[in-house]
Amino acid sequence: VKHFLKSLAYIVFLSYGCHAATLSELRTSIRRNVRDTSTSASFQRYSDSDLTSLINEAQREITNSVWMLQTETSYVSAASTMFTNLPSDLLAVIKVGYLKTGATTRTDLPEKTLSGLTAMNPNWESQTGTPTNYYIRQRTDNTLKQIGLYPAPVSASTGTVYITYAVMPNDLSDSSDVPFNGASWLVPYHKGLSDYVSGRIKQIEGKTDEATGYFQLAGAEINRMRERLGELPNYTPGMVTGSVGTSGGTNR
């Protein structure tokens, strides 16, 4: 089994090494791995829809493991506004900076949790002034996350909030869609998606040894991404490596 998987990994690497893998190509690769290559949909064990769902699951899992897509957004704070919606593609806030109106230097704002703010000052919600911290909360209708500033700015202390955040890529749907929002520098890591999905299918079919082999290949791909792509969260995908990282703290 190990020899077969190594040979297969090499073949797939050659096929992905020169160009981006589209959704259609990923599905074809997975069908080869799990021996579901009939050209007739009537004889395929897994529909294109099934494979697309698993590929999107893999994309989310890998992105949760390695925050490789990041961007920055900004907004101008208002004295009358306590919370501001965060982008819908936000995975996690990485850094927040504040440039007070009229100032020339941007200040980094440390994060505080809601419980940490309460422990620090039970009346924190009524405090106003120049922001020194930010906090994240879930919007009351559970559709988006929101950012708040502490203390809340007044007219004399408004400014521009700069948010660097990790992006959750769009799900793939069209056959020509490319993983990870089409980022060209992530092309070498597309193979991890087909390895992950092949492992999931082998697991579903009860082929534990083959599933483990594919998960090890996917895990190796994730580890390469971690080594090469910079800042990482304290998170380990249980499906690939068998453990989940945790972190804790007080008065954050």
Residue ranges and their predicted role:
Residues K2-Y10:
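Sec-dependent signal peptide recognition
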Residues A20-R252:
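Glycine-enriched, solvent-exposed interface loops adjoining structured elements
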Residues V1-K2, T22:
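N-terminal hydrophobic targeting signals that begin at the initiator methionine
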Residues F13-A20:
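Sec/Tat signal peptide C-region and signal peptidase I cleavage site
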Residues Y10-F13, K95:
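Exposed boundary/loop context
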